[in-house]
Each structure stands twice: as C-alpha cells, then as structure tokens.
Amino acid sequence: MPTIQQLIRTERSRLKAKTKSPALKSCPERRGVCTRVYTSTPKKPNSALRKVARVRLTSGFEVTAYIGGVGHNLQEHSVVLIRGGRVKDLPGVRYHIIRGTLDTAGVKDRRQSRSKYGAKTPKE
C-alpha cells in the first residue's frame, strides 16, 4: 500500500478498457472479403450447424464472422460488411456479417425485425 506522499508524487494509473472488437479499429463497420464459408458447431448445451465465414478485412485482420438469418448466398470472394457483436455459443466468433449490403443478400420472406436482416417491405 503506497503512502500519501508516494501517491502525491505519482498518481495511480487508470486501467485501460480493452476493446471487444479489435479488428474494427474503432470503426462501426469494416469491409472484407470471404476467404472461407463453412458451418460450425456450438458449445456444450446447444446443438446446431451455425453458418460462419472467415473474412479478410481492409484493416488487415482475418476474423471469423457469423452469418445470421435463414439461408445465405455467400461464397468465397464475396465482399461483405462486418459489425461487432459476438455469438455466445461459438468460441472465437466476435463479429456479425451485415445482411442486405454489398454481396450479402437480405433474408427472403422476413416480416418481423426486417431491418436487422436487410429485408425489404413485403408486397401485399
């Protein structure tokens, strides 16, 4: 424990908050190119085949990103936009691919939460 004199001499250093999405480099989104599109299995209590893609970003990072929604049109060399946000049951997946932008199509026949999946207003 420091003395008051030691604290006067040198102030306590603040702890720097570590970012949860370092590959974005303080940007809201980043563009990248898919290098591999595949499925992955989640952690213990859950069971599924989650769609993920390995993406090389313009910031120089290569990250694993989750493809949300039902069905997708992504393949190798597709250009995608990535946002932060992890997938709790997939270790190492800290990013999401934004649907409805660049080469990523929106989800078909989506009626609720359309803005999250890049779906246009359905025709009546």
From Swiss-Prot:
Modified residues (3-methylthioaspartic acid): D89
Top-rank lineage group of the source organism: Bacteria
Gene3D superfamilies in the cross-refs: Nucleic acid-binding proteins (2.40.50.140)
Gene Ontology biological-process entries: translation
GO MF term (any one): rRNA binding
Keywords noted in UniProt: Methylation, Ribonucleoprotein, Ribosomal protein, RNA-binding, rRNA-binding, tRNA-binding
GO cellular component entries: small ribosomal subunit
Regions annotated as coiled coil: none
Annotated spans, Disordered: 104-124
InterPro entries: NA-bd_OB-fold, Ribosomal_uS12, Ribosomal_uS12_bac
Protein family according to the UniProt entry: Belongs to the universal ribosomal protein uS12 family.
Subunit text: Part of the 30S ribosomal subunit. Contacts proteins S8 and S17. May interact with IF1 in the 30S initiation complex.
Function: With S4 and S5 plays an important role in translational accuracy. Interacts with and stabilizes bases of the 16S rRNA that are involved in tRNA selection in the A site and with the mRNA backbone. Located at the interface of the 30S and 50S subunits, it traverses the body of the 30S subunit contacting proteins on the other side and probably holding the rRNA structure together. The combined cluster of proteins S8, S12 and S17 appears to hold together the shoulder and platform of the 30S subunit.
PANTHER family: 30S RIBOSOMAL PROTEIN S12 FAMILY MEMBER (PTHR11652)
Name used for this protein in its record: Small ribosomal subunit protein uS12
Species whose genome carries this gene: Parasynechococcus marenigrum (strain WH8102)
Taxonomy of the source species: Bacteria, Bacillati, Cyanobacteriota, Cyanophyceae, Synechococcales
Gene name, Swiss-Prot/TrEMBL: rpsL
